[in-house]
Amino acid sequence: MELSGATMARGLAVLLVLFLHIKNLPAQAADTCPEVKVVGLEGSDKLTILRGCPGLPGAPGPKGEAGVIGERGERGLPGAPGKAGPVGPKGDRGEKGMRGEKGDAGQSQSCATGPRNCKDLLDRGYFLSGWHTIYLPDCRPLTVLCDMDTDGGGWTVFQRRMDGSVDFYRDWAAYKQGFGSQLGEFWLGNDNIHALTAQGSSELRVDLVDFEGNHQFAKYKSFKVADEAEKYKLVLGAFVGGSAGNSLTGHNNNFFSTKDQDNDVSSSNCAEKFQGAWWYADCHASNLNGLYLMGPHESYANGINWSAAKGYKYSYKVSEMKVRPA
């Protein structure tokens, strides 16, 4: 069927309107977007409707009800520890527990393996002079002064005079036990000296210093002191040498005497007469436990005397007697 000219003209008009509408859409979108309709076509033409732009959003609706609580999730990793809080108050003291059973007595490990003298300490690497603990043959611990510097070291000092701070004119009991101060003058005690020298052989060294600072010494090959039952008898070996000379050999095999126990061979009490305590014979050639008389003195033989060096009227400033295993 042929289309009439009028129909074709109307179709072209519709297309032209659509073209112009589409071309103007960007500009209209910037301002408004009115609804576009094409209606009223005559005859057999179909009705064509063009949809306009969306309208403005409406007002938000009311808030809905909360949903059902979901399942609990898995536990997360622990967080970093926080700062420590302030220290709380001290708690009450608890009740005292029950006393344990007494253990079996055993030998001290220190006694079994500990040092026996200062030479033993030196051999173990103790090179500093000073006070150390050693163990006597009966396992008694004893604190002694070790001379690690003189003549190769390893000397156990049992007598020291240095400043007159300690009274050496004492009785038998005091010399038996020992007396004095670690910081100054002392006598180690006849029981301890006996224990130190009873086992094996020990050499003796005597060191003397006068008030002019001159040093002298004397050495003996062996030295032992017997026990109290033998009145601490001196058993002395040969004089080896030394700048002080020999002032002790004459006391060999003599008993120890004090002002209250006269064991010498003199008709008088030498300890009382010369105000000391020593292995007096018919009195002495040395008196290192005599009075501290500050060098030259007018009195006779009652100072810290070593007659072979300075006679009987000079009292030494420093005296040390020491032993070492031979």
From Swiss-Prot:
Record's compositionally biased regions (Basic and acidic residues): 90-104
GO biological process: cell surface pattern recognition receptor signaling pathway; complement activation, lectin pathway; G protein-coupled receptor signaling pathway; host-mediated suppression of symbiont invasion; positive regulation of interleukin-8 production; positive regulation of opsonization; protein localization to cell surface; proteolysis
Residues annotated as binding a carbohydrate: D282, C283, H284
Renumbered residue ranges of the record's region P domain: 317-326
InterPro entries: Collagen (IPR008160), Fibrinogen-like_C (IPR036056), Fibrinogen_a/b/g_C_1 (IPR014716), Fibrinogen_a/b/g_C_dom (IPR002181), Fibrinogen_C-term_domain (IPR050373), Fibrinogen_CS (IPR020837)
Molecular function, one GO term: signaling receptor binding
Bridged cysteine pairs (disulfide): C111-C139, C118-C146, C270-C283
Membrane topology value: Peripheral membrane protein
Collagen-like domain sequence ranges: 55-93
Region listing for B domain, in residue ranges: 155-243
Glycosylated position list: N305
SMART domains, per the entry: FBG (SM00186)
Keywords for the protein's UniProt record, in alphabetical order: Calcium, Cell membrane, Collagen, Disulfide bond, Glycoprotein, Immunity, Innate immunity, Lectin, Membrane, Metal-binding, Repeat, Secreted, Signal
Biased composition range(s): Low complexity: 77-89
Tissue distribution of the protein: Peripheral blood leukocytes, monocytes and granulocytes. Also detected in spleen, lung, and thymus, may be due to the presence of tissue macrophages or trapped blood in these tissues. Not detected on lymphocytes.
Effect noted on mutating G250F: Inhibits binding to the 9-O-acetylated sialic acid derivatives
PROSITE patterns: FIBRINOGEN_C_1, FIBRINOGEN_C_2
Domains as described in the record: The fibrinogen C-terminal domain mediates calcium-dependent binding to carbohydrates and tethering to the cell surface in monocytes and granulocytes. The domain undergoes a conformational switch at pH under 6.2, and looses its carbohydrate-binding ability.
Assembly behavior: Homotrimer. Interacts with elastin/ELN. Interacts (via Fibrinogen C-terminal domain) with FFAR2. Interacts with CRP; may regulate monocyte activation by FCN1.
Similarity comment text for this entry: Belongs to the ficolin lectin family.
Role played: Extracellular lectin functioning as a pattern-recognition receptor in innate immunity. Binds the sugar moieties of pathogen-associated molecular patterns (PAMPs) displayed on microbes and activates the lectin pathway of the complement system. May also activate monocytes through a G protein-coupled receptor, FFAR2, inducing the secretion of interleukin-8/IL-8. Binds preferentially to 9-O-acetylated 2-6-linked sialic acid derivatives and to various glycans containing sialic acid engaged in a 2-3 linkage.
Protein name: Ficolin-1
Species in which this protein is naturally found: Homo sapiens (Human)
